[in-house]
Amino acid sequence: MEAPTLSELEGLRYSELQKLAKTVGLKANLKADKLLKDLKVHFYPESKDESPDYDGGSSLTDTDELNSSQEKDEPVSVSFVTHRRGRGRKPLKNHDTPKDEFLSVSVGAGTESLASETDNTQHQNCLESKKKEVSPPTIDNKHRKRSRSEDTSKQNNLETTEKRQKKASDITSAPSAGKIPRYVGRLSKPESKPSTPNFKKLHEAHFKKMESIDKYMERKQKRLDTVSSSIQEMKMLTKKSNLLKLVEKTPVSDIKKPVKSRLSLLSSLPPTTGASPSRTPTNQRRSGRFSAANKSILFDRSGFKPSVLSSSKMNVRFSEATKDNEHKRSLIKTPARKSSSFLAITPESEPRQMLPNVKKTPARKSLSVLAVTPESEPKQMLPSVKKNEPMTTPEKAKKTDLNTTIQPSTVILESTCPQNKEIAITPFKFTAQTTETPNTNKKGKFNLQASLSRPLGYQPHKGKLKPWGGSEENKCGSNNNVSVLKNNFKQPHLQTREDRRKQHEQDRKGKRDQTLGTRRGVPVQ
């Protein structure tokens, strides 16, 4: 690798010096002055011998700096590579200055600042010219580079001053037509403060835009009328077309024919003329669509309306209607339908006679058998049976006391056989519940002597009675339970079937005591 000259080393940037130091094998993480010194010593070791008091900058530069500090008031710091690009440039726009201060600045103040800036630039130019005169001829390369940088800085300064002068002239000069200056226009306008809008006015404006209800209803009615009129027109047209088709298809003879009823069995058939009733002529055949549309659902096509809808409640006694066969009324007796769920037996109405049954006891009779109608009055049941004794008439039976209940043991059956023959008698036990009237339902007064004379239904207790609820039978049970828990606290005692059985017995005993206490009128705790 070729060794760079001293001027080249001084002209290199800091990053390039670091790369060079790395390639050579020197430490690159140093300051710019020290790094340049190390590189010079590495490439030119004789420079160290010639100038033993070399401190990171040449003696010539030190003397130059001393002379310049003596001659000038403001010292110029000489640095080789430490300056970054753009450090020396001043910003074109000063963002830190607030707008209010800029607005408050008058036109005269702007002109004074411009004059002071021009003086400063002239002073800098003079200093630079002096520096050129003082600088020795040995450092030509450095001065060339400095002069280049100074020329560029001069050009930048001139450009900035020209721009500022233009701005100042724009502000001072009267605004041209259509061009308002940047900040003068804002000064004239007051700052708009955020204020709440007047909602009342806004609502009124919206309400005025809205349509009134009357207008809306009129518009709606018109729309409905137009739609409904078109629909009605279509309906009328379809009806007319259907009627025309029917008139064309059906002849006059078919139209005048009567409609047959569904129940043709009850009414006589009219004489059929022409085609058979089973077949329909071709001109009468229509699709189901037209027939369903033309005929109403509620229209009843059959002329016959039956008066009797169910046969369960039909009157079968034709003799009442005709009023003939009155002498046969006793023979023709059809029983009226009664529900078997309710049975009312009064002392006036007696049960029915049993049919003659030899050597057989009757089975349990249903309630419907015992139902007696006032029309059909059976033979009376008598308490005793005696031959050739006159029977009691229904009138006499009615005269008997209502409070007395009949408890017959036997039933006499009147038969058509002669009287000299014996009649088979079957015992009958009356099990039906008689409805008690308010007269029979009256309770008599309690007779103490009669109740004491009656034998007891239970065996009375003999001896001294225990105090009620005072003694506890199962006192030791709780202690045992506690002892069990103490002994087996690691494994708790699980409830077994025996325990459940004992608990159940105890509950039953408690219920029994409670019922006995309530029956005897003792207050149960």
Swiss-Prot record:
Compartment(s): Cytoplasm; Nucleus; Cytoplasm, Cytoskeleton, Spindle
Compositionally biased region (Polar residues): 58-69, 113-127, 270-285, 476-494
Feature: compositional bias, Basic and acidic residues: 93-102, 160-169, 495-514
Composition bias, Basic residues: 82-92
One annotated GO molecular function: microtubule binding
Any Gene Ontology biological process: mitotic cytokinesis
GO cellular component: cytoplasm; microtubule; mitotic spindle; nucleolus
KW Protease (keyword) present: no
Region (Disordered): 43-203, 250-293, 373-398, 452-525
Keyword tags: Cell cycle, Cell division, Cytoplasm, Cytoskeleton, DNA-binding, Meiosis, Microtubule, Mitosis, Nucleus
Top-level taxon in the UniProt lineage: Eukaryota
InterPro entries linked to this entry: NuSAP
Family: Belongs to the NUSAP family.
Cited function: Microtubule-associated protein with the capacity to bundle and stabilize microtubules. May associate with chromosomes and promote the organization of meiotic or mitotic spindle microtubules around them.
Full protein name: Nucleolar and spindle-associated protein 1-C
Organism of derivation: Xenopus laevis (African clawed frog)
Gene this chain is encoded by: nusap1-c
